[in-house]
From Swiss-Prot:
SUPFAM superfamilies: Acyl-CoA N-acyltransferases (Nat). Disulfide bonds: none annotated. PANTHER family: GLYCYLPEPTIDE N-TETRADECANOYLTRANSFERASE, N-MYRISTOYL TRANSFERASE. Tetradecanoyl-CoA binds at Y34, L35, F36, W37, L167, C168, V169, S175, K176, R177, L178, A179. Keywords: Acyltransferase, Cytoplasm, Transferase. This is Glycylpeptide N-tetradecanoyltransferase. Adds a myristoyl group to the N-terminal glycine residue of certain cellular proteins. It comes from Yarrowia lipolytica (strain CLIB 122 / E 150).
Length: 443
Protein backbone atom coordinates (compact mmCIF):
# COMPACT_ATOMS: atom_id res chain seq x y z
CA UNK A 1 0.00 0.00 0.00
CA UNK A 2 1.35 3.44 -0.90
CA UNK A 3 2.10 6.03 1.77
CA UNK A 4 -0.55 8.37 0.33
CA UNK A 5 -3.20 5.65 0.48
CA UNK A 6 -2.20 4.77 4.04
CA UNK A 7 -2.46 8.41 5.12
CA UNK A 8 -5.88 8.72 3.48
CA UNK A 9 -7.22 5.65 5.29
CA UNK A 10 -5.77 6.77 8.62
CA UNK A 11 -7.20 10.28 8.27
CA UNK A 12 -10.66 8.90 7.44
CA UNK A 13 -10.50 6.61 10.47
CA UNK A 14 -9.48 9.49 12.76
CA UNK A 15 -12.26 11.73 11.46
CA UNK A 16 -14.87 8.99 11.86
CA UNK A 17 -13.77 8.36 15.43
CA UNK A 18 -13.80 12.09 16.19
CA UNK A 19 -17.17 12.80 14.60
CA UNK A 20 -18.83 10.28 16.93
CA UNK A 21 -18.07 12.64 19.81
CA UNK A 22 -19.08 15.96 18.26
CA UNK A 23 -22.90 15.89 18.62
CA UNK A 24 -22.86 15.47 22.42
CA UNK A 25 -20.29 18.19 22.83
CA UNK A 26 -22.34 20.55 20.72
CA UNK A 27 -25.28 20.36 23.10
CA UNK A 28 -25.56 23.38 25.31
CA UNK A 29 -28.34 23.94 27.79
CA UNK A 30 -30.82 26.75 27.36
CA UNK A 31 -29.74 30.07 28.82
CA UNK A 32 -32.38 29.80 31.56
CA UNK A 33 -30.91 26.49 32.73
CA UNK A 34 -27.54 28.01 33.59
CA UNK A 35 -28.68 28.99 37.08
CA UNK A 36 -25.31 30.42 38.07
CA UNK A 37 -23.90 31.76 34.80
CA UNK A 38 -27.02 33.69 33.87
CA UNK A 39 -26.33 35.85 36.94
CA UNK A 40 -22.76 36.62 35.83
CA UNK A 41 -21.38 39.20 33.37
CA UNK A 42 -20.93 36.81 30.44
CA UNK A 43 -22.44 36.96 26.93
CA UNK A 44 -25.46 34.89 26.01
CA UNK A 45 -25.20 32.30 23.26
CA UNK A 46 -25.45 33.84 19.78
CA UNK A 47 -25.61 37.32 21.26
CA UNK A 48 -25.19 40.08 18.69
CA UNK A 49 -21.97 41.88 19.56
CA UNK A 50 -21.70 45.35 18.06
CA UNK A 51 -18.65 46.42 20.04
CA UNK A 52 -16.05 44.69 22.18
CA UNK A 53 -15.34 45.62 25.78
CA UNK A 54 -16.31 45.16 29.44
CA UNK A 55 -19.87 44.15 30.22
CA UNK A 56 -20.05 45.62 33.72
CA UNK A 57 -18.21 48.67 35.03
CA UNK A 58 -17.62 48.59 38.78
CA UNK A 59 -15.45 50.40 41.28
CA UNK A 60 -13.48 49.22 44.27
CA UNK A 61 -16.14 50.53 46.64
CA UNK A 62 -18.62 48.15 44.98
CA UNK A 63 -16.63 45.08 46.02
CA UNK A 64 -18.05 42.99 48.84
CA UNK A 65 -15.66 43.35 51.83
CA UNK A 66 -16.23 39.90 53.35
CA UNK A 67 -16.02 36.36 51.94
CA UNK A 68 -19.12 34.67 50.57
CA UNK A 69 -21.01 32.39 52.91
CA UNK A 70 -20.39 28.65 52.85
CA UNK A 71 -22.57 25.85 54.24
CA UNK A 72 -22.14 25.62 58.01
CA UNK A 73 -19.89 22.55 57.94
CA UNK A 74 -17.27 24.23 55.72
CA UNK A 75 -14.88 27.14 56.08
CA UNK A 76 -12.59 29.26 53.92
CA UNK A 77 -8.83 28.89 54.11
CA UNK A 78 -5.93 30.38 52.17
CA UNK A 79 -3.45 28.01 50.56
CA UNK A 80 0.13 29.07 51.25
CA UNK A 81 1.71 28.03 47.96
CA UNK A 82 5.18 28.43 49.48
CA UNK A 83 4.33 25.80 52.09
CA UNK A 84 5.14 22.28 50.79
CA UNK A 85 2.45 20.77 53.02
CA UNK A 86 -0.22 23.01 51.48
CA UNK A 87 1.01 22.23 47.96
CA UNK A 88 0.80 18.53 48.81
CA UNK A 89 -2.82 19.00 49.89
CA UNK A 90 -3.63 20.69 46.57
CA UNK A 91 -1.83 17.89 44.73
CA UNK A 92 -3.83 15.23 46.60
CA UNK A 93 -7.14 17.00 45.90
CA UNK A 94 -6.38 17.38 42.19
CA UNK A 95 -5.00 13.85 41.86
CA UNK A 96 -8.15 12.27 43.25
CA UNK A 97 -10.79 14.64 41.90
CA UNK A 98 -9.61 16.74 38.95
CA UNK A 99 -10.11 16.44 35.20
CA UNK A 100 -10.56 13.02 33.65
CA UNK A 101 -11.34 12.13 30.07
CA UNK A 102 -14.93 11.10 29.29
CA UNK A 103 -14.15 7.40 29.61
CA UNK A 104 -12.39 7.82 32.97
CA UNK A 105 -9.25 6.31 31.44
CA UNK A 106 -6.76 9.11 32.15
CA UNK A 107 -6.35 11.89 34.71
CA UNK A 108 -3.93 14.81 34.79
CA UNK A 109 -1.12 14.29 37.29
CA UNK A 110 -0.04 17.73 38.49
CA UNK A 111 3.22 17.32 40.41
CA UNK A 112 4.32 19.60 43.23
CA UNK A 113 7.00 21.11 40.98
CA UNK A 114 4.40 21.71 38.25
CA UNK A 115 2.08 23.51 40.68
CA UNK A 116 4.96 25.62 41.98
CA UNK A 117 5.68 26.71 38.41
CA UNK A 118 2.04 27.20 37.40
CA UNK A 119 0.92 29.16 40.45
CA UNK A 120 3.83 31.54 41.04
CA UNK A 121 4.37 33.73 37.96
CA UNK A 122 5.48 37.34 38.41
CA UNK A 123 2.83 39.32 40.28
CA UNK A 124 1.15 36.35 42.00
CA UNK A 125 -0.97 37.25 45.02
CA UNK A 126 -1.15 35.28 48.28
CA UNK A 127 -4.91 35.74 48.56
CA UNK A 128 -5.66 34.27 45.13
CA UNK A 129 -5.48 30.62 46.21
CA UNK A 130 -8.59 30.09 48.35
CA UNK A 131 -9.69 26.63 49.37
CA UNK A 132 -12.63 25.17 51.25
CA UNK A 133 -12.02 22.91 54.23
CA UNK A 134 -14.25 20.73 56.38
CA UNK A 135 -14.58 22.79 59.57
CA UNK A 136 -14.43 19.79 61.88
CA UNK A 137 -11.35 18.12 60.37
CA UNK A 138 -9.52 20.74 58.31
CA UNK A 139 -9.60 18.47 55.23
CA UNK A 140 -9.28 20.38 51.95
CA UNK A 141 -12.29 19.62 49.73
CA UNK A 142 -12.26 22.41 47.12
CA UNK A 143 -9.77 24.79 45.52
CA UNK A 144 -9.50 27.52 42.89
CA UNK A 145 -6.65 29.75 41.74
CA UNK A 146 -5.99 32.98 39.88
CA UNK A 147 -2.76 34.31 38.39
CA UNK A 148 -2.21 37.73 36.79
CA UNK A 149 -2.05 38.13 33.04
CA UNK A 150 -2.50 40.70 30.29
CA UNK A 151 -4.54 39.83 27.22
CA UNK A 152 -4.23 41.48 23.82
CA UNK A 153 -7.50 41.03 21.91
CA UNK A 154 -7.23 42.36 18.37
CA UNK A 155 -6.66 46.13 18.43
CA UNK A 156 -8.44 46.73 21.73
CA UNK A 157 -6.68 48.21 24.73
CA UNK A 158 -4.60 45.71 26.67
CA UNK A 159 -6.87 43.78 29.05
CA UNK A 160 -5.56 43.56 32.60
CA UNK A 161 -6.92 40.23 33.76
CA UNK A 162 -6.35 36.96 35.58
CA UNK A 163 -6.30 33.37 34.43
CA UNK A 164 -8.61 31.17 36.49
CA UNK A 165 -7.45 27.58 36.82
CA UNK A 166 -7.53 24.39 38.90
CA UNK A 167 -11.16 24.75 39.98
CA UNK A 168 -11.68 21.46 41.78
CA UNK A 169 -14.37 20.15 44.14
CA UNK A 170 -14.22 16.79 45.86
CA UNK A 171 -16.28 14.25 43.93
CA UNK A 172 -18.51 13.45 46.89
CA UNK A 173 -19.43 17.11 47.33
CA UNK A 174 -20.43 18.03 43.77
CA UNK A 175 -24.09 18.38 44.85
CA UNK A 176 -23.20 21.03 47.44
CA UNK A 177 -22.83 23.71 44.72
CA UNK A 178 -19.46 24.79 46.04
CA UNK A 179 -18.11 25.65 42.58
CA UNK A 180 -20.29 28.77 42.11
CA UNK A 181 -19.26 30.00 45.56
CA UNK A 182 -15.60 29.43 44.72
CA UNK A 183 -15.98 31.40 41.49
CA UNK A 184 -17.72 34.29 43.25
CA UNK A 185 -15.10 34.33 46.00
CA UNK A 186 -12.11 34.35 43.64
CA UNK A 187 -13.87 37.09 41.64
CA UNK A 188 -14.26 39.14 44.82
CA UNK A 189 -10.60 38.73 45.74
CA UNK A 190 -9.41 39.65 42.26
CA UNK A 191 -11.75 42.65 42.16
CA UNK A 192 -10.14 43.88 45.38
CA UNK A 193 -6.97 44.37 43.31
CA UNK A 194 -8.91 46.49 40.79
CA UNK A 195 -8.96 43.71 38.17
CA UNK A 196 -12.33 43.06 36.52
CA UNK A 197 -11.73 40.62 33.67
CA UNK A 198 -10.69 36.96 33.59
CA UNK A 199 -9.78 34.25 31.12
CA UNK A 200 -10.64 30.61 31.73
CA UNK A 201 -11.08 27.38 29.81
CA UNK A 202 -13.33 24.35 30.15
CA UNK A 203 -14.18 21.22 28.26
CA UNK A 204 -17.88 21.80 28.90
CA UNK A 205 -20.00 24.35 27.07
CA UNK A 206 -20.88 27.40 29.16
CA UNK A 207 -22.16 30.86 28.19
CA UNK A 208 -20.41 31.75 26.00
CA UNK A 209 -17.15 30.57 24.38
CA UNK A 210 -15.03 33.19 22.63
CA UNK A 211 -13.26 30.29 20.89
CA UNK A 212 -13.03 26.51 20.78
CA UNK A 213 -9.90 24.50 20.05
CA UNK A 214 -9.37 20.79 19.64
CA UNK A 215 -6.64 18.55 21.01
CA UNK A 216 -4.36 16.70 18.61
CA UNK A 217 -1.91 13.99 19.61
CA UNK A 218 1.35 12.85 18.03
CA UNK A 219 2.25 9.31 19.21
CA UNK A 220 5.88 8.91 20.22
CA UNK A 221 5.67 5.48 21.86
CA UNK A 222 2.82 4.00 19.88
CA UNK A 223 3.05 0.54 21.49
CA UNK A 224 2.66 2.02 24.98
CA UNK A 225 -0.27 4.18 23.85
CA UNK A 226 -1.99 1.16 22.34
CA UNK A 227 -1.47 -0.98 25.43
CA UNK A 228 -3.05 1.59 27.76
CA UNK A 229 -6.03 2.31 25.49
CA UNK A 230 -4.94 5.72 24.22
CA UNK A 231 -4.49 4.64 20.59
CA UNK A 232 -6.27 2.16 18.34
CA UNK A 233 -5.32 0.21 15.23
CA UNK A 234 -7.14 1.58 12.15
CA UNK A 235 -8.87 -0.84 9.76
CA UNK A 236 -6.54 -2.90 7.55
CA UNK A 237 -3.48 -1.93 9.60
CA UNK A 238 -1.27 -3.83 12.03
CA UNK A 239 0.61 -2.90 15.16
CA UNK A 240 3.86 -3.20 13.23
CA UNK A 241 2.70 -0.78 10.53
CA UNK A 242 1.63 1.75 13.17
CA UNK A 243 4.98 1.53 14.96
CA UNK A 244 6.75 2.05 11.64
CA UNK A 245 4.55 5.04 10.79
CA UNK A 246 5.38 6.90 13.99
CA UNK A 247 9.09 6.06 14.21
CA UNK A 248 11.22 9.20 14.44
CA UNK A 249 14.87 9.95 13.69
CA UNK A 250 17.19 10.72 16.59
CA UNK A 251 18.84 13.72 14.97
CA UNK A 252 17.11 17.11 15.11
CA UNK A 253 17.15 18.80 11.66
CA UNK A 254 17.64 22.29 13.09
CA UNK A 255 20.62 23.49 15.08
CA UNK A 256 18.91 24.14 18.39
CA UNK A 257 20.15 24.64 21.92
CA UNK A 258 18.50 24.94 25.30
CA UNK A 259 17.21 28.40 26.15
CA UNK A 260 18.97 30.20 29.02
CA UNK A 261 18.31 33.37 30.99
CA UNK A 262 20.66 35.19 28.62
CA UNK A 263 18.12 34.59 25.83
CA UNK A 264 15.15 36.15 27.62
CA UNK A 265 15.35 39.59 26.01
CA UNK A 266 15.68 38.17 22.48
CA UNK A 267 12.95 35.57 22.99
CA UNK A 268 10.63 38.21 24.43
CA UNK A 269 11.04 40.36 21.32
CA UNK A 270 10.43 37.62 18.75
CA UNK A 271 7.58 36.12 20.80
CA UNK A 272 5.66 39.40 21.00
CA UNK A 273 6.19 40.06 17.29
CA UNK A 274 5.08 36.56 16.39
CA UNK A 275 1.96 36.64 18.57
CA UNK A 276 0.95 39.95 16.98
CA UNK A 277 1.30 38.41 13.52
CA UNK A 278 -0.30 35.02 14.23
CA UNK A 279 -3.11 35.58 16.73
CA UNK A 280 -6.14 37.72 17.49
CA UNK A 281 -6.13 36.93 21.21
CA UNK A 282 -2.83 36.41 22.98
CA UNK A 283 -1.04 36.87 26.25
CA UNK A 284 1.09 40.00 26.39
CA UNK A 285 4.34 38.91 28.04
CA UNK A 286 6.79 40.93 30.08
CA UNK A 287 10.45 39.91 30.10
CA UNK A 288 9.99 38.68 33.67
CA UNK A 289 7.13 36.44 32.55
CA UNK A 290 9.22 35.05 29.68
CA UNK A 291 11.93 34.14 32.18
CA UNK A 292 9.45 32.45 34.50
CA UNK A 293 7.49 30.48 31.94
CA UNK A 294 10.33 29.34 29.68
CA UNK A 295 13.55 29.11 31.72
CA UNK A 296 13.31 26.11 34.03
CA UNK A 297 15.68 26.40 37.00
CA UNK A 298 16.35 22.68 36.58
CA UNK A 299 18.77 22.31 33.70
CA UNK A 300 19.12 18.52 33.66
CA UNK A 301 16.75 17.19 31.00
CA UNK A 302 16.25 13.82 32.67
CA UNK A 303 15.39 15.26 36.10
CA UNK A 304 11.86 14.18 37.08
CA UNK A 305 11.17 17.62 38.56
CA UNK A 306 11.94 19.47 35.32
CA UNK A 307 8.72 20.87 33.85
CA UNK A 308 9.37 23.15 30.88
CA UNK A 309 11.74 22.53 27.98
CA UNK A 310 12.64 25.56 25.86
CA UNK A 311 14.97 25.84 22.88
CA UNK A 312 16.28 28.54 20.57
CA UNK A 313 17.73 28.64 17.07
CA UNK A 314 20.58 31.05 16.41
CA UNK A 315 21.87 32.53 13.19
CA UNK A 316 25.09 34.55 13.21
CA UNK A 317 24.86 34.78 16.98
CA UNK A 318 21.29 36.11 16.95
CA UNK A 319 18.24 34.21 18.25
CA UNK A 320 15.80 33.88 15.36
CA UNK A 321 13.42 31.14 16.57
CA UNK A 322 12.15 29.72 19.83
CA UNK A 323 9.92 26.81 20.86
CA UNK A 324 8.92 25.09 24.08
CA UNK A 325 6.89 22.26 25.55
CA UNK A 326 6.07 21.23 29.09
CA UNK A 327 5.68 17.96 30.94
CA UNK A 328 2.31 16.91 32.33
CA UNK A 329 2.03 13.22 33.09
CA UNK A 330 -1.29 11.39 33.11
CA UNK A 331 -2.38 8.68 35.50
CA UNK A 332 -3.81 5.63 33.71
CA UNK A 333 -6.98 4.68 35.57
CA UNK A 334 -8.03 1.44 33.89
CA UNK A 335 -7.35 -1.62 36.06
CA UNK A 336 -6.45 -3.72 33.04
CA UNK A 337 -3.69 -1.36 31.91
CA UNK A 338 -0.16 -2.71 32.29
CA UNK A 339 1.21 0.78 32.97
CA UNK A 340 -0.04 3.39 35.46
CA UNK A 341 1.67 6.50 34.05
CA UNK A 342 1.65 8.24 30.67
CA UNK A 343 4.52 10.64 30.08
CA UNK A 344 3.02 13.48 28.03
CA UNK A 345 4.58 16.55 26.46
CA UNK A 346 2.32 19.53 25.73
CA UNK A 347 3.22 22.01 23.04
CA UNK A 348 3.70 25.42 24.67
CA UNK A 349 4.63 28.76 23.10
CA UNK A 350 6.88 29.19 20.08
CA UNK A 351 7.92 32.04 17.81
CA UNK A 352 9.83 32.70 14.63
CA UNK A 353 11.35 35.72 12.96
CA UNK A 354 10.16 34.43 9.56
CA UNK A 355 7.21 36.79 9.28
CA UNK A 356 7.39 37.90 5.64
CA UNK A 357 4.17 36.01 4.85
CA UNK A 358 1.75 33.58 6.49
CA UNK A 359 3.22 30.72 4.44
CA UNK A 360 6.81 31.55 5.39
CA UNK A 361 5.78 31.76 9.02
CA UNK A 362 3.88 28.47 8.96
CA UNK A 363 6.61 26.62 7.06
CA UNK A 364 9.15 27.66 9.66
CA UNK A 365 6.83 26.73 12.53
CA UNK A 366 6.48 23.25 11.04
CA UNK A 367 10.26 22.88 11.17
CA UNK A 368 10.32 24.07 14.77
CA UNK A 369 7.58 21.71 15.95
CA UNK A 370 9.10 18.86 13.97
CA UNK A 371 12.26 19.42 15.99
CA UNK A 372 10.28 19.66 19.23
CA UNK A 373 8.64 16.29 18.58
CA UNK A 374 12.02 14.61 18.02
CA UNK A 375 13.49 16.19 21.15
CA UNK A 376 10.48 15.09 23.23
CA UNK A 377 10.83 11.56 21.90
CA UNK A 378 14.55 11.52 22.73
CA UNK A 379 13.67 12.61 26.28
CA UNK A 380 11.39 9.63 26.77
CA UNK A 381 8.00 11.30 26.32
CA UNK A 382 5.33 8.98 24.96
CA UNK A 383 2.92 11.43 23.33
CA UNK A 384 3.14 15.06 22.16
CA UNK A 385 -0.08 17.07 22.44
CA UNK A 386 -1.12 20.30 20.74
CA UNK A 387 -4.25 22.40 20.40
CA UNK A 388 -5.52 23.87 17.14
CA UNK A 389 -4.27 27.35 18.01
CA UNK A 390 -1.66 29.71 16.57
CA UNK A 391 -0.18 28.13 13.41
CA UNK A 392 -0.64 24.55 14.62
CA UNK A 393 -3.33 23.58 12.06
CA UNK A 394 -0.81 24.07 9.25
CA UNK A 395 1.47 21.26 10.43
CA UNK A 396 -0.66 18.79 12.39
CA UNK A 397 -1.33 16.47 9.46
CA UNK A 398 2.19 16.66 8.02
CA UNK A 399 3.77 15.85 11.38
CA UNK A 400 1.41 12.89 11.88
CA UNK A 401 -0.73 14.28 14.68
CA UNK A 402 -4.13 12.64 15.04
CA UNK A 403 -7.28 14.44 16.18
CA UNK A 404 -8.35 13.66 19.71
CA UNK A 405 -11.81 13.62 21.22
CA UNK A 406 -11.10 16.54 23.54
CA UNK A 407 -12.18 20.15 22.94
CA UNK A 408 -11.18 23.19 24.94
CA UNK A 409 -13.49 26.19 25.12
CA UNK A 410 -12.03 29.62 25.89
CA UNK A 411 -14.06 32.11 27.92
CA UNK A 412 -13.70 35.77 28.86
CA UNK A 413 -15.35 36.93 32.09
CA UNK A 414 -16.92 40.39 32.09
CA UNK A 415 -15.82 41.05 28.53
CA UNK A 416 -17.88 40.95 25.36
CA UNK A 417 -15.91 39.88 22.27
CA UNK A 418 -16.41 38.68 18.75
CA UNK A 419 -15.46 35.02 18.22
CA UNK A 420 -11.79 34.16 17.75
CA UNK A 421 -10.92 31.43 15.26
CA UNK A 422 -9.87 28.23 17.03
CA UNK A 423 -8.44 26.34 14.08
CA UNK A 424 -11.71 24.47 13.41
CA UNK A 425 -14.50 24.76 10.88
CA UNK A 426 -18.22 24.60 11.71
CA UNK A 427 -18.06 20.79 11.80
CA UNK A 428 -15.21 21.01 14.33
CA UNK A 429 -12.73 19.74 11.74
CA UNK A 430 -9.26 21.16 11.19
CA UNK A 431 -9.20 24.46 9.31
CA UNK A 432 -6.11 26.55 8.70
CA UNK A 433 -6.59 30.21 7.94
CA UNK A 434 -3.91 32.60 6.75
CA UNK A 435 -5.25 35.02 9.30
CA UNK A 436 -5.14 34.96 13.07
CA UNK A 437 -6.54 32.75 15.81
CA UNK A 438 -6.09 31.90 19.48
CA UNK A 439 -2.69 32.72 20.94
CA UNK A 440 -3.23 31.95 24.62
CA UNK A 441 -2.07 28.64 26.08
CA UNK A 442 -3.37 27.83 29.55
CA UNK A 443 -1.98 25.01 31.65
Amino acid sequence: MSADKFNEILKMFQQQMAMQDIPDREKAKKWEEYLFWKTQPVPKFDEDIDSEGPIEHKKLEDVRPTPYNLPAEYEWSDVDIENPEHIQEVYDLLYDNYVEDDDATFRFKYSASFLDWALKPPGWQKTWYPCVRVAATGKMVAFISAIPTSIQLRDNDLIKAVEINFLCVHKKLRSKRLAPVLIKEITRRVNQKDIWQALYTAGVVLPSPVSTCRYYHRPLNWTKLYEIGFSAIPPNQTAASMVARYTLPKEVPLKVRAMTKADVKAVHAILQNYLSAASEMSQHFSEEEVAHWFVDPISEDKNDDKIVYSYVVEEDGKVIDFFSFYKLDHTVLKEWATESNLRAAYGFYYATSSLSSAKARQDRVKELIGSAVILANNLGFEVYNELTLLDNPSHLDDLKFGCGDGYLNYYLFNYRAQPVHGGLDKQKQLEQLDGKGVGVIML
